Design a protein with these regions (language model features):
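Active-site neighborhoods and metal-handling regions in enzymes and metal-associated proteins
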Residues: 1-538
Length: 538
């Protein structure tokens, strides 16, 4: 693999023993523009999560359980071996490097695409073995000769009729939260947080209506760092009216060096190392989780109304698709990719449709057990009138984002398939019917979705539910429903999915969108519930 060979020459020239490629960009998001997909470029693995490490004579890729099957297939014939992250017997990256490299070695990482927390954690472990970290190098700028450019698509307004709150008021709320935490400002680097605060949308990231930018907010100023060519006159006028200045994207380092406020809040779990390094040493760093994330997660009345309207239209498209599907399969000729195109066309005919919210997962038979499977011309399976079809899909409408999964029986099922389907459905219903007190976290509710399967010795390794943006990213925090995750209270106005699964057979999972609201009949007891937002039969 010439890319790995070229990288090893680079390592020798720079006196580095290894280089680490994470699955992040300078904004530390889940989905990243092609310009920063360095891990995929060096390894060939295209999953959304994973870390590649290359040394002078070895190469390995760590990824989680969602991608074990896909990674094994995609890494065949490459220098990389698969490390099944989180599984017993799999070393961490730090353990592997400490056992592989001699004391005095230096490991390279690009400071722009590695978070403060991830580097600190690795640094502590490597330091014990006398191994250092160099954050100053980016081999891709030299070796990636056909590297895609940084996206420069236009930025558009997200009108008040869909956002429900002016940007100036969101900034006022943000400043109040910062003041309460003893911070004079903050750097917002997550693209969905910038887009939400500014009431702007873009198309720089596949399936996510965001744009490449940073936002620096102090008590007196708000500065949006973005390529000026992306902004039309209407956007400039809107920002000026909201009290927001604009500067070129590349000017952020200089602005940070000139930062004269006493303190700045940084979410070290989602802020890259270089942002911290450019701030003056006299600046006090307030390390705290993002205060924008929980603000964004609690939807206002306009956003909730938009969610319901978007899901109603999406439900119409889904019901039309399901009515078409079984007769079409019985007639023959349909494949995973052809039904994907059909569903896209039905969604695209709905008002306010803008895009899909993630690449559709249409997995027939064994493909349904591959988490985040995506059909390609070489894997495109023909659909037969038997067994299960997993269909996980969603759309971006200007008034809301959708995400729905259905596991569809295309014909006769085995007894095992019926049992598995029933267990997953029982978990889905048990969670959907939950009543819970104010302050409960997703980690406490997760067992409801798993209980029926646990009684049969079955478990699934992925999360059960995630938040969903409002015409933004389909995955949103800080709240989630899963076993192992930092707790975040579920609050009225949040949206969350309900998607238990069984990937031991072709029966996979169901999913529907739920919102969280106070139960009006039990409000005095502060009870909450999950009223369904999505209308589509199971």
């Amino acid at each position: 693999m010439t890319r790995v060979e070229d990288l090893r020459r680079f390592l020798r020239e720079k006196d580095l023993a290894a280089f680490i490629f994470p699955s992040t960009d300078p904004h530390c998001g889940e989905y990243i523009p092609a310009h920063w997909q360095a891990r995929q470029w060096i390894s060939g693995f295209n999953g959304s999560a994973g870390t590649a490490v290359v040394t002078a004579d070895d190469a390995a890729l760590w990824t989680d359980s969602r991608y074990f099957i896909a990674a094994e297939q995609q890494l065949q014939g490459t220098p990389f071996r698969l490390m099944k992250d989180g599984m017993q017997g799999t070393p961490t990256i730090a353990q592997w490097l400490c056992s592989t490299l001699p004391s005095g070695s230096r490991v390279g990482m690009d400071g722009w695409v590695n978070t403060i927390d991830s580097v600190r954690s690795l640094e502590r472990e490597l330091d014990a073995s006398g191994i250092g970290i160099d954050l100053s190098l980016d081999p891709c700028s030299q070796l990636w000769t056909e590297r895609p450019t940084v996206p420069d698509n236009p930025v558009v307004l997200h009108p008040i009729e869909f956002s429900g709150e002016e940007s100036s008021h969101k900034l006022q709320r943000l400043r109040h939260a910062l003041s309460a935490l003893g911070a004079d400002g903050t750097v917002v680097s997550q693209l969905d947080e910038v887009a939400w605060l500014m009431n702007l949308r873009g198309s720089d990231v596949h399936c996510n209506p965001v744009f490449v930018s940073y936002l620096l907010v102090t008590m007196q100023r708000a500065i949006l760092f973005v390529n000026p060519a992306k902004l039309g006159d209407d956007v400039r006028e809107y920002l000026a009216g909201q009290g927001v200045e604009t500067m070129p994207y590349a000017d952020l380092p200089h602005a940070l060096q000139e930062y004269r406020e006493g303190s700045v809040l940084l979410d070290t779990s989602s802020t890259n190392c270089n942002i911290l390094s450019y701030l003056p040493k006299t600046c006090r760093i307030v390390e705290h989780p993002s205060v924008v994330s929980p603000m964004k997660a609690v939807k206002n009345e306009t956003e909730i109304r938009g969610f319901r309207q978007a899901m109603l239209r999406d439900g119409v498209a889904m019901v039309k698709f399901l009515r078409w599907l079984v007769p079409a399969v019985q007639a023959g000729g349909e494949t995973e990719m052809s039904i994907d195109r059909k569903l896209y066309s039905l969604r695209a005919s709905q008002p306010l449709f803008r895009d899909i919210s993630f690449d559709t997962i249409a997995g027939y038979a064994a493909h349904g057990a591959i988490v985040h499977y995506e059909a390609t011309p070489s894997t495109d399976a023909s659909l037969m009138p038997r067994g299960f079809l997993l269909l996980d899909s969603g759309a971006q409408y200007q008034d809301g984002t959708t995400d729905i999964t259905r596991t569809i029986a295309l014909g006769p099922l085995t007894d095992r398939e019926r049992t598995d389907y029933t267990l997953v459905l029982r978990g889905h219903i048990r969670l959907a019917m939950a009543r819970f007190p104010e302050g409960a976290c997703g980690t406490q509710l997760d067992v409801l979705a798993r209980y029926a399967m646990w009684q049969h010795g079955i478990n699934y390794l992925h999360g059960t539910g995630h938040g969903v943006g409002s015409y933004l990213n389909v995955h949103e925090g800080p709240h989630q429903i899963r076993m192992n995750y930092k707790p975040a209270p579920l609050r009225a106005g949040m949206t969350v999915t309900d998607e238990p699964g069984n990937h031991y057979t072709e029966c996979s999972y169901f999913k529907r969108k739920l919102s969280i609201k106070n139960n009006p009949y039990q409000k005095k007891d502060e009870k909450h519930s999950f009223p369904p937002c999505y209308i589509c039969h199971i």
